A protein has these predicted regions:
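The −1 position to Zn-ligating cysteines in a subset of zinc-ribbon hairpins
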Residues: 7, 14-17, 153, 282
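Conserved aromatic-histidine-acidic binding/catalytic patches
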Residues: 6, 15-19, 122, 126
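Iron-sulfur cluster-binding electron-transfer modules in prokaryotic oxidoreductases
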Residues: 24-359
């Protein structure tokens, strides 16, 4: 096993570029799973187990967020855990989305039509507002939102850190939960491009999880919304006083799926949005990759062209469908980053949208 294979970010850009459709990144990941003899370190296990860490961190969110920003704490993590001291950690929310949702579940059941929602780690532990933004849009369109019976992290960080057996167990649980939702007549939506790609493609290709029956019903929320609008099944109305200059970054896994068009076309439906598509570049963080001391400089060098273009454009916000891209861009530029769903929710004329959809 060549340890240099660990330098692969699994961004899939080699697969996008390959004219023969060779799944190069999959071959590298399969080799890492099969032949790597190195046991995951404590650092790698911590970075990979997002559900466990998120559960601990959110319960002490104010303290956690304060501590993770202290230079002495960063220095200790750098020297002991080899998590680079220059890396900025995402903040945690004291109230998770699941906790918030329990108080509103009855309201969601009152709708005649429903979708199921896989929120993932970020929209649960770090930024529940993204999940709330999705509910705002779907409710205005006449759809209630149900959570899955059970949900675990999609497992992308587990695979990247040598814990593929655990990733497979979590993947099987997620697929079984989605099957129940689909059997009830609900499509399953997500708000993370990486979660979507992992469950749709990596489960089958890397973890050998049978998901053929689930994949057609699993979609990124922007893709589902765009297709529903185009088919005339839902209508969106937007505020006349909303104006923003946005720069859209196509996350690597979004590019591999070919789904950026859905997010950008939805954003273009907002009359007050001036949208610029950023050049096709990886931001460099690749999930947990950019947190590791041995990768940090390389991570920042990979993202440098993207950061430069963003600073030159000076948008009001950067838009992207990937949460780790958001962390990297916000840390490395002067701009804040929003998921397209959050922009749509902010721009939405809720009352008019409800009227148009008879919600």
């Amino acid at each position: 096993f060549d340890e240099k294979l660990k330098l692969c970010l699994n961004c899939k850009r080699c697969e996008v570029a390959c004219p023969e459709n060779v799944k190069i990144a999959d071959l590298i990941q399969e080799a890492r799973i099969k032949y790597s003899t190195a046991k995951p370190s404590l650092r790698d296990r911590m970075l990979a187990n997002t559900d466990f860490v998120g559960t601990l961190a959110h319960n002490f969110a104010p303290i956690t967020n304060f501590a993770l920003g202290l230079k002495p704490v960063k220095a200790v993590m750098d020297s002991v855990l080899k998590i680079d001291k220059h890396r900025t950690f995402p903040s945690y929310s004291f109230q998770t989305f699941e906790q918030w949702y329990k108080k509103h579940a009855a309201e969601q059941e009152a709708y005649k039509k429903h979708v199921a929602y896989f929120h993932g780690c970020y929209a649960n532990y770090n930024f529940p507002q993204l999940s709330k933004d999705l509910l705002k849009i779907l409710n205005a369109c006449g759809y209630g939102v149900r959570l899955l019976e059970k949900e675990k992290c999609c497992g992308v960080a587990l695979v990247a850190n040598g814990l593929s057996d655990q990733a497979k167990k979590q993947g099987e649980l997620n697929m079984n939960s989605m099957r129940k939702a689909i059997a009830a007549g609900d499509d399953v939506l997500t708000t993370s491009s990486t979660c979507t790609f992992t469950m749709r493609d990596e489960y089958k290709n890397l973890l050998k999880i049978d998901n053929d029956d689930v994949a057609p019903h699993l979609s990124l929320a922007t893709r589902w919304l765009y297709r529903m609008v185009e088919s005339g099944k839902i209508k969106l109305a937007f505020r006349k006083d909303f104006h923003q200059k946005l720069a859209y970054h196509t996350a690597c896994h979004m590019e591999r799926m070919g789904w950026a068009i859905y997010s950008t076309e939805l954003l273009r439906m907002i009359p007050g949005v001036e949208l610029t598509l950023l050049d096709s570049n990886c931001c460099g963080i690749s999930g947990t990759y950019g947190f590791k001391k041995e990768n940090y400089k390389r991570s920042q060098a990979i993202g440098a062209p993207l950061f430069k273009q963003i600073e030159e454009l000076k948008p009001d916000f950067v838009s992207t469908d990937c949460e780790t891209c958001k962390w990297q861009i916000e840390m490395s530029t002067s701009r804040k980053v929003k998921n397209p769903i959050s922009t749509l929710a902010e721009a939405l004329d809720v009352e008019e949208t409800r009227r148009l959809n008879k919600a």
